[in-house]
Amino acid sequence: MAELSPEFILNMTSDAKVRIIVEKIRKLSNITTRPPEMTLYNDQFDPEQCPGTLLPFTCYVITGTAGAGKSTSISALYQNLNCLITGATTVASQNLSRCLKTYCPTIFNAFGFKSKHINILPRSVPRRTLDTIEQIQNFELCKYWPILTSIIQEFSKKKNLGQYSSISLAAFNMLAKMTTTLWTTNVIVIDEAGTLSSHILTAVVFCYWFYNSWLNTPLYRSGAVPCIVCVGSPTQTDAFNSTYNHIQQKYNIMECDNILSFIIGNKVVSEYISLTNNWALFINNKRCTDPEFGHLLKTLEYSLKISPKTMEYIDRFVVPKAQILNPLEFLGWTRLFLSHAEVKSYLSSLHTALVTGTNVSGAKLFTCPIVCEVFTKAFNEYKSHVNLPSLTATEWLSKNLHRLSNYSQFIDQDMTAIHTETTDTSTKVTYLTKYVKNTYISLNGKTKKCVCGYVGTYKNFKKILESESFIDSHANDQPEFVYSFLCTILYNSLYNFHNYGVTEKNESYLNDLANLKLPENLTHLYTQTDLDIEREALMLEDDVFYHMVSPPPTASSASLPCLISWYTALKDIFISRLKLATTWFSNKFLDREFTSFTINMLVRDNIEFTSTNGRLHGLLEYASTVESYKLQGYTFLPVNFGRSQTTVISKDLQDKMPSIVVQDSSGFIACLEKNVNKMLETLDDGKSFHLCSAGDYGISSKLAMTIVKAQGTSLDKVAICFSNHKKIKVSHIYVAISRATNPNHIVMDCNPLKLLVNDTQSISSQHIIKALNNPNTLLVY
């Protein structure tokens, strides 16, 4: 019998306690109350002027050391309860989606927050004594009310009042199984909740009650109290509040309570939710099972005294800073930095190394334009409102570049302004950004992709066909399009076998290839005599298949049974040709590169995908936020992504931008839709200005990232640069180090613990230590 791994044993020891967590949350979700009156929350309502009613909620808290199994325990909730699984950040939601194999939104998406709300800033509310849960809720609601007002107004326009008033319980339960939202379940799970400001908790509770009241759902009618499951670590990265100063044109950023420290540290809140009975603490690190590494994480998690032995242990990871900053060292490792500027600087140095011709594991540098358009009329109105008459469009762009797109990693990119054009209507600026082929990227939002080809080996493509894995993962809604796509790929790929024989000048192989039997359903217009005559008339350089078989029908011109018949026949031909090729050229043929596209494709300079065809077509679907895609290049071919985006940006700017081409883990090639969004500037008086539209590609490099972005991820190889920052926090060290899955694959430029010897214990750590000694707290080892 094989020896059981430490990871398996640790997970099995957690099993019984995880079952208890599920049952406790199930009981909390069954609590009902008299539903609060929500009609008072209208356009005229303002919580600062008139406090609202108590919005009841329950809460279950899951905390613990990084990698201890907090996030993976969410899968038990997903399997056993009807619950809405969300992440606090895009990275957290992507990791959840990967674990659960389903789409998990961010909590912001779940309660209706959109990109246009980014620049609506929370209020600054004066501090005051808060003795009751009602006062605390109203205080938190006041902060976020400008955003919540916009969200509920939009929801009220899209959804009919009383939409589910007459729905039966059976029909509603069916709806809940089909789609999980704030109005189909009262269990809301938030992973990495420690990164969220405290007012987000009240925002989620408010939106739950408002949405269910507006729709008059069975949940509202029965008074089902929302159960918010907060997962994370209060001692990891801090939460921040930001306010934008329009006069100075800069953000003022301040630390604030995160949801977990708010729940744990606020006596009124912790007593309201009965925290001592609704708190699970995960103890052992399962991401990396090295005992010394686990002890290091516990020391940081609980702010324990740092022993000389711990100091010596972390000294092992220290290497010269120059090695980490050198892109030719630690190839394939993810660099972690404290600031966006450092990420950008590292990427620039990597790109410089590629420009000078230094070989970095076969990587190749290419550039793509990013475009911005500032609208003159709106910009002049904005300047007048904020009393900045001398501010120019280019000055505003330089100061607000980091705010132009809808994700924080936009500013990390190595980009340079190369062209500015000013007209009466707008100022157009084009930037050039650098990317590296064959490096991995992640997507930052819901992006359409057009799957248009495959690049891999014959062996791997054969496995895909035989397992039908592509069909299983793509043919849920409209299988006819999936079969049509595969038919086209197979049909176009069969020439590869003939072309190889011509290249090798193997006439015997070509004769055998020409005499392979073709399925009758593809050649029904010909008699056997016709086929024999056609074969005899052709030269060896001609592939008989394409003379006998016309291209497969499209999804819109044939029925599903017809397309399946075509797919089965073409797959049989592919397998028979592959078998013949391996007979003639041995099994080494299976490892040869296999390429096929929906059109005749040429790749210029190994980067630009082009064709004599006027348009690139393929299988249209949404790109996975779960998967890491490998950059392959770009194409200027027109790609049909269905309904076009409505965001305003000049056509000449859009035409400058190509579509990024990526490869998924299976080998399929796809084009990504461009990320075009508009920037709304919202002033304190509620006045909004559509100042700018920006177009980029919505992708982030996995070569380097900030420590904050890395929270919630597991990284195989990590190189951390703490640099010379004067205010390194325990939370920074904790998050960065705990990303590692193997202590043999982690390096850093210094021992940051030496700067923290006199660091005071955090309030959250004090509460956690008390909880460890509380018999009512559930400890999961």
Swiss-Prot record:
Domain of life: Viruses
Keywords in alphabetical order: ATP-binding, DNA replication, Helicase, Host nucleus, Hydrolase, Nucleotide-binding
EC number(s) reported in the record: 3.6.4.-
Gene3D superfamilies for this protein: P-loop containing nucleotide triphosphate hydrolases
UniProt subcellular location: Host nucleus
Main location: host cell
Annotated positions binding ATP: 64-71
EC class name: hydrolase
One CC-aspect GO term: host cell nucleus
GO function term, MF aspect, one: ATP binding
Stored InterPro entries: DNA_helicase_dom, HSV_HELI, P-loop_NTPase
One GO term of the biological process aspect: DNA replication
Function comment: This protein may be a helicase and is required for replication of viral DNA.
HAMAP family according to UniProt: HSV_HELI
Family named by the database record: Belongs to the herpesviridae helicase family.
Assembly behavior: Associates with the primase and the primase-associated factor to form the helicase-primase complex.
Protein name: DNA replication helicase
Native source organism of the sequence: Saimiriine herpesvirus 2 (strain 11) (SaHV-2)
